[in-house]
UniProtKB/Swiss-Prot annotation:
Single biological process term from Gene Ontology: cholesterol import
Organism whose genome encodes this protein: Homo sapiens
Pfam families, alphabetized: START
Keywords: Lipid transport, Lipid-binding, Transport
UniProt catalytic activity: cholesterol(in) = cholesterol(out)
Gene Ontology cellular component annotations, sorted alphabetically: cytoplasm; cytoplasmic vesicle; cytosol; endoplasmic reticulum
A molecular function GO annotation: cholesterol transfer activity
Name the UniProt record assigns to this protein: StAR-related lipid transfer protein 4
Parts of the chain that traverse the membrane: none
Main function: Involved in the intracellular transport of cholesterol. Binds cholesterol or other sterols.
Keyword Disulfide bond appears in the UniProt entry: no
Length: 205
């Protein structure tokens, strides 16, 4: 399991990568989709031949409640309509784990079901929390799924200054879905997935 000989430094490197994304200047992003409650932007990824997506919206709940629903655990399967299974393969200290999860087909199954094996880390960030992840090269594969790969991704959640009962949730996602999929289909799916994620989460809270 490459890269996990030193979990603490692996987690710190991942966290620092996400903080770097969080400081990218606004003029580097292009709007991919906008709804009443959520905006999704994108820019070319430096990790692979695809896009880094940024999503942002206000959620009417406390930071810890929101992140508890997002990070790996029993809450996530209850509300995330894209996720079809989630197993914790290994637990480490300091809010780190390895999880395997599967996603449903999308766009009338142009994008077939996917499987991911990710390292996940949740850590304090300013007055809030950051829950971040990255895929691992895991040998065991299931033939009924295409193995996707998440380059560094994560969710920053901080309380609003003027109303601490509301939180600003900002996500950074760069998923290589792999397989033979037109880029236009990937772009449509990613933008819709992110806006749906906020809708599902709001209903669950």
């Amino acid at each position: 399991m490459e890269g996990l000989s030193d979990v603490a430094s692996f987690a710190t490197k991942l966290k620092n990568t996400l903080i770097q994304y969080h400081s990218i200047e606004e003029d580097k992003w292009r709007v991919a989709k906008k709804t009443k409650d959520v905006t999704v932007w994108r820019k070319p990824s430096e990790e692979f031949n695809g896009y880094l997506y940024k999503a942002q919206g206000v959620i009417d709940d406390l930071v810890y409640s929101i992140i508890d629903h997002i990070r790996p655990g029993p809450c996530r399967l209850d509300w995330d309509s894209l996720m079809t299974s989630l197993d914790i393969l290994e637990n480490f200290e300091e809010n780190c784990c390895v999880m395997r999860y599967t996603t449903a087909g999308q766009l009338w199954n142009i994008i077939s079901p996917r499987e991911f094996v990710d390292f996940s880390y949740t850590v304090g960030y300013k007055e809030g929390l950051l829950s971040c992840g990255i895929s691992l090269d895991w040998d065991e594969k299931r033939p009924e799924f295409v193995r996707g790969y998440n380059h560094p991704c994560g969710w920053f959640c901080v309380p609003l200054k003027d109303n601490p009962n509301q939180s600003l949730l900002t996500g950074y996602i760069q998923t290589d879905l792999r397989g033979m999929i037109p880029q236009s289909a990937v772009d449509t799916a990613m933008a819709s997935t992110l806006t749906n994620f906020y809708g599902d989460l709001r209903k669950a809270l």
